[in-house]
């Protein structure tokens, strides 16, 4: 990377390197897990780590004592050390979050020694990182619910902060991830475990190495949140040898642990990704080098960061702002956002990262007051407030101070008047912009581009990088044009023609709006993965071109849903909300910019305002809220709505401009578009859908009711490169059905139909899979089926194919209805009939077999029969997320019992059908006996409807739960009160754990030293685990 300014020594200290030459492979011979471990330890020792042998908690504590004494220049006597340990270092009541807080926030302890002198005892020296002692231990054994051996642990000042889990080359890396997951449940967090201090996990199979934060947050625990290390050009560093030579350099690792991790106020530990660190480092380097050269207030003294939407810009900009405040020559850091709503969101986000370091300002006077305070160096403000302040105040002390400006999404009104004022008023500033969509000459409306205002690009991480690293998802774009009479209108791209009044009216033709609304209602559940009873799936947004369009759609949805509810008592309407306001006629800075809607509703015309009032009243009556269109009430409505979209309380949100930029909701997977989008606006709007969430969310679904194909390709080419189209856009339906070659990797991917036919040929009867090799082959093949089906269910063509399986082909009325609903002509209909999908029953049987093998494999593993096995299961990953997404809930199963009974099917046949269903469901397998007993012991004819069956089942299950709990307590001779308390807690959290003391308190009086104690504890624990699996979700008293 060439830098134009004076280079200072600091620039060579980047931890994300510009250059790195890969290590040569040391040999081609087979490398076992222990070989890999030996090599890693040797490499770390060569890099200056000290290897020590520590095998017990007490030895680990003794080492911590020695390291902290050296670091702090003190000596503890035994009673002082005991006091320090019990009160602070390893307080028995500390959980994992308390320990993390001690590394990030409370890392200095004011300790009073026996002779009454007070000393600051540091756990870690954050000012001078290289003073911290780094050591390694291996194969430390920790007792917990299961004794676990940890591969390699890195200690900092004696405390275990990094855990490395290795698997031999060729093993699926997810295996190592799952193992860490198991440890954190079983023993990292057992009482008095210093392993609660762990900050960072590193997993590797030699070929692929990833790191991730130790967090208890379930959504951040997914494998998708693991990351590779990388160079500054985003080339990944995957091999363990290369990872060790770069990320495990002592200076680098300590920086990641201390400077590039954040423990936020929602108590989530976040560790930054390499591109976030690289950008932050380069901003700090630029500020320092410009200051040294006295070269401020010019484009050369700043720069911009191009990081794609959804890649975590807020965390990066926060860290850059936070670390800039620590430079002693900087007086203030302004974090400037563009809109009122973003101001609030950024304040919330910033406060999440660090509650004390941010001053928001309600208005310009508030901003002025904040400038006078010395205690906080970071100020969050909007460009509008900053501009008003500069216009109103000709002389402020801050104008002559050393100031850093960081602009979030730096491409809007900052280009205008505010920039001129800023350059006039501030004498010594360094200005940086973050953007996901820079303005280049190609998409600029005037002469100004991102680079001409902010200076050169300091770091980039574009959408192709993010998709390759699986940090954002691809887009699947449907150009939906099934309305022949509106075709010429929907394919028009000439802006002048589009804005002509008669065309605007034609877009709002009631027939067109009704057809599109009906399409959305028909396809909503399929697009948002809600086709299975009880599945939560995702939610969606509809972006429309004007306030009139929003009104028309909202009213049409309401009418069509009311009509459907009148026809069917079981119809469940979608929960729909809308928000829009007045968009001031501001000049655009770039082609395709989404015009900015303000929170000022007073400028709206009266009919739009009345309509919005009515929509908000409906929202209020549903959610028991009290919002309105007056300015404060409207702002609060915006905030409440944003939260409810994130929580999935809203199914579909209709918007004009708001929420299409800067709004982040990982549960949103579909955007319906009836407006013309281009360049920046298109990328911003599409990016609402492509946040990673879990394995069921494979891409962002975009369904456009106008022809945006050319605009889409133009936008992704501008913000990526010429090959971006192949990376950013999902493959076609035909490619997934028939197979394709991946352009990026050159790998041939089999089509869905090939997988189906192999499945049916090799495993016609899933109940007869006997040998271990057959089991493994089946699991791999059915896993491939689940992954392909999960992707295909987003395609309309696949939904049509599945719908065809459900109709009676001998019924001409049903056939004609099907053709009309799915826009299928005779030729297409004949073609569809040639494609055969496996019957639903067959898939249920396959799912049961898959679940059975998973259970069997877990039992085998626990019994450690693996030693004798000749089949290597290491490269098999069970697709648990995909199974869960198609869960069938208990209410559905009970409804089925009611239907079967009404059709006078015998109990024997009914029980077989119910067993098949339950076994194919991951969450309800343990309830099989309970449901079967219920059928056998209940006179179903006495129950008149579905609701009574559900009530009767829960009454029955609660009675059984009570009876079995008492029997278990008696049989195992447990302490009754403690056992009931422990069972109640476990039922509430839906799993049993051996962490903490709750389980021990239930056991009969036996000394923990008695050899039978451990056996007894294990036996009781296993029985309670089965009990919880069987009765969770049943309710009732214990």
Curated annotation (Swiss-Prot):
Assembly behavior: A monomer in solution. The type I restriction/modification system is composed of three polypeptides R, M and S; the restriction enzyme has stoichiometry R(2)M(2)S(1) while the methyltransferase is M(2)S(1). There is an equilibrium between R(2)M(2)S(1) and R(1)M(2)S(1); the latter is methylation and translocation proficient but restriction deficient. (Microbial infection) Holoenenzyme interacts with Escherichia phage T7 protein Ocr; this interaction leads to the inhibition of the restriction activity, but may still allow methylation and translocation.
Region: Helicase domain, residue numbers: 732-860
EC number: 3.1.21.3
Domain (Helicase ATP-binding): residue spans on this chain: 294-439
Protein's recorded name: Type I restriction enzyme EcoR124I/EcoR124II endonuclease subunit
UniProt keywords, alphabetically: ATP-binding, DNA-binding, Endonuclease, Hydrolase, Nuclease, Nucleotide-binding, Plasmid, Restriction system
Residue numbers spanned by region Helicase-CTD linker: 859-886
GO biological process: DNA restriction-modification system
This protein's record includes keyword Hydrolase: yes
Keyword DNA-binding: yes
Source organism: Escherichia coli
PROSITE patterns from the UniProt entry: HELICASE_ATP_BIND_1
Region (Nuclease domain) residue spans: 31-249
Location of the region described as Motor 2-helicase linker in the Swiss-Prot/TrEMBL record: 720-732
Biological function: The restriction (R) subunit of a type I restriction enzyme that recognizes 5'-GAAN(6)RTCG-3' (for EcoR124I) and 5'-GAAN(7)RTCG-3' (for EcoR124II) and cleaves a random distance away. Subunit R is required for both nuclease and ATPase activities, but not for modification. After locating an unmethylated recognition site, the enzyme complex serves as a molecular motor that translocates DNA in an ATP-dependent manner until a collision occurs that triggers cleavage. The enzyme undergoes major structural changes to bring the motor domains into contact with DNA, allowing DNA translocation.
Reactions listed under catalytic activity: Endonucleolytic cleavage of DNA to give random double-stranded fragments with terminal 5'-phosphates, ATP is simultaneously hydrolyzed
Region described as Motor 2 domain: 470-702
One Pfam family, short name: HSDR_N
Domain notes: The individual domains assume different positions in the enzyme, allowing the holoenzyme to regulate the methylase, endonuclease and translocation states. Deletion of the linkers between the domains prevents movement and thus restriction activity.
Motif position, DEAH box: 408-411
Domain of life, source organism: Bacteria
């Amino acid at each position: 990377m060439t830098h134009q300014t004076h280079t200072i020594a600091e620039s060579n200290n980047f931890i994300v390197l510009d250059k790195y030459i890969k290590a040569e492979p040391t040999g081609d011979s087979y490398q076992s897990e222990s070989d890999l471990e030996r090599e890693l330890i040797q490499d770390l020792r060569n890099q200056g780590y000290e290897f020590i042998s520590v095998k017990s908690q007490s030895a680990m504590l003794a080492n911590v004592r020695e390291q902290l004494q050296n670091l702090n220049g003190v000596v503890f006597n035994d009673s002082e050390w005991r006091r320090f340990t019990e009160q602070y270092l390893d307080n028995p009541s500390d959980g994992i979050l308390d320990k993390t807080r001690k590394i990030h926030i409370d890392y200095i302890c004011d300790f009073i020694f026996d002779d009454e002198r007070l000393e600051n005892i540091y756990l870690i020296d954050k000012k001078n990182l290289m003073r911290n002692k780094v050591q390694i231990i291996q194969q430390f054994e920790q007792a917990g619910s299961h004794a676990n051996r940890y591969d390699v642990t890195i200690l900092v000042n004696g405390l275990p902060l990094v855990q490395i889990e290795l698997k031999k080359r060729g093993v699926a890396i997810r295996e190592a991830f799952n193992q860490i997951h198991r440890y954190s449940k079983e023993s990292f967090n057992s009482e008095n475990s210093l392993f609660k201090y762990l900050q960072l996990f590193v997993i590797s199979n030699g070929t692929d190495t990833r790191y991730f934060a130790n967090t208890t947050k379930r959504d951040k625990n997914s494998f998708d949140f693991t990351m590779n290390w990388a160079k500054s050009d985003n080339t990944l560093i995957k091999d363990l040898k290369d990872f060790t030579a770069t990320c495990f350099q002592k200076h680098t690792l300590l920086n990641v642990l201390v400077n590039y991790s954040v423990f936020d106020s929602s108590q989530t530990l976040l560790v930054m990704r390499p591109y976030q660190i690289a950008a932050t480092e380069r901003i700090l380097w630029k500020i320092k080098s410009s200051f040294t050269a006295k070269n401020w207030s010019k484009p050369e003294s700043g720069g911009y960061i191009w990081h794609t939407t959804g890649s975590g810009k807020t965390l990066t900009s926060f860290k850059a702002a936070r670390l800039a405040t620590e430079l002693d020559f900087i007086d203030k850091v302004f974090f400037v956002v563009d809109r009122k709503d973003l101001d609030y969101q950024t304040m919330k986000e910033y406060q999440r990262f660090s509650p004390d370091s941010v001053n928001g300002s309600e208005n310009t006077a508030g901003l002025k007051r904040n400038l006078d305070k010395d205690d906080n160096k970071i100020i969050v403000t909007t460009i509008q407030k900053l501009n008003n302040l500069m216009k109103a105040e000709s002389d402020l002390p801050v104008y002559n101070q050393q100031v850093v400006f960081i602009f979030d999404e730096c491409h809007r009104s900052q280009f205008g008047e505010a920039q001129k004022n800023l350059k006039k008023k501030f004498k010594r500033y360094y200005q940086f912009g973050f953007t996901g969509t820079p303005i280049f000459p190609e998409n600029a409306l005037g002469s100004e581009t991102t680079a001409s205002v902010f200076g050169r690009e300091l770091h980039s991480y574009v959408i192709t990088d993010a998709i390759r690293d699986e940090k954002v998802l691809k887009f699947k774009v449907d150009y939906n044009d099934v309305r022949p009479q509106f075709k010429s209108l929907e394919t028009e791209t000439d802006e002048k023609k589009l804005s002509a009044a008669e065309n605007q009216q034609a877009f709002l033709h009631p027939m067109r709006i009704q057809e599109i609304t009906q399409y959305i209602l028909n396809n909503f559940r399929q697009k948002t993965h809600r086709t299975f009873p009880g599945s939560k799936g995702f939610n969606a947004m509809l972006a429309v071109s004007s306030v009139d369009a929003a009104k028309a759609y909202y009213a049409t949805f309401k009418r069509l849903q009311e009509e459907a509810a009148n026809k069917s008592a079981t119809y469940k309407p979608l929960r729909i909300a809308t928000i829009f306001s007045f968009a001031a006629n501001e000049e655009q800075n770039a082609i395709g910019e989404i015009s900015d809607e303000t929170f000022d509703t007073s400028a709206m015309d009266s009919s739009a305002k009345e309509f919005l009032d009515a929509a908000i009243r409906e929202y209020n009556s549903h959610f028991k809220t009290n919002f309105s269109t007056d300015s404060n009430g409207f702002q609060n409505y915006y905030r409440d709505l944003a939260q409810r979209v994130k929580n999935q309380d809203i199914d579909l949100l209709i918007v004009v401009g708001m929420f299409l930029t800067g709004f982040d909701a990982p549960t949103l997977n579909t955007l319906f578009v009836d407006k013309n989008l281009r360049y920046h606006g298109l990328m911003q709007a599409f990016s609402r859908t492509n946040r990673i969430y879990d394995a069921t969310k494979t891409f962002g679904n975009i369904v456009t009711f106008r022809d945006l194909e050319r605009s889409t390709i133009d936008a992704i080419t501008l913000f990526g490169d010429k090959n971006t189209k192949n990376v950013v856009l999902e493959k076609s339906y035909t490619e997934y059905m028939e197979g394709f070659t991946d352009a990026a990797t050159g790998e041939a991917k089999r089509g869905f139909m090939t997988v189906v036919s192999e499945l049916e040929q090799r495993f016609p009867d899933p109940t007869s899979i006997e040998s271990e090799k057959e089991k493994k082959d089946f699991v791999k093949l059915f896993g491939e089926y689940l992954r392909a089906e999960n992707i295909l269910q987003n395609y309309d063509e696949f939904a049509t194919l599945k719908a065809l399986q459900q109709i009676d082909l001998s019924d001409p009325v049903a056939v004609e209805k099907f053709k009309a609903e799915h826009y299928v002509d005779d030729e297409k209909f004949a073609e569809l009939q040639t494609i055969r999908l496996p019957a639903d029953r067959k898939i249920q049987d396959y799912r049961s077999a898959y679940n059975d093998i998973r259970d069997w494999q877990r039992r085998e593993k626990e019994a450690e029969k693996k030693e004798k096995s000749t089949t290597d299961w290491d490269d098999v990953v069970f697709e648990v997320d995909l199974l869960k997404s198609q869960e069938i809930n208990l209410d559905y199963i009970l409804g089925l019992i009611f239907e079967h009974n009404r059709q006078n099917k015998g109990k024997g046949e009914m029980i077989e059908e119910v067993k098949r269903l339950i076994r194919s469901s991951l969450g309800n397998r343990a309830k099989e006996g309970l449901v079967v007993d219920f059928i056998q012991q209940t006179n179903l004819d006495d129950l008149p409807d579905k609701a009574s069956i559900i009530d009767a089942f829960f009454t029955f299950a609660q009675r059984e739960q009570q009876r079995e709990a008492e029997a278990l307590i008696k049989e195992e001779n447990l302490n009754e009160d403690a056992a009931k308390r422990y069972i109640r807690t476990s039922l509430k959290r839906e799993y049993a754990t051996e962490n903490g003391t709750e389980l021990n308190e239930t056991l009969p009086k036996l000394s923990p030293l008695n050899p039978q104690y451990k056996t007894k504890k294990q036996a009781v624990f296993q029985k309670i685990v089965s009990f919880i699996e069987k009765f969770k979700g049943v309710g009732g008293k214990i």
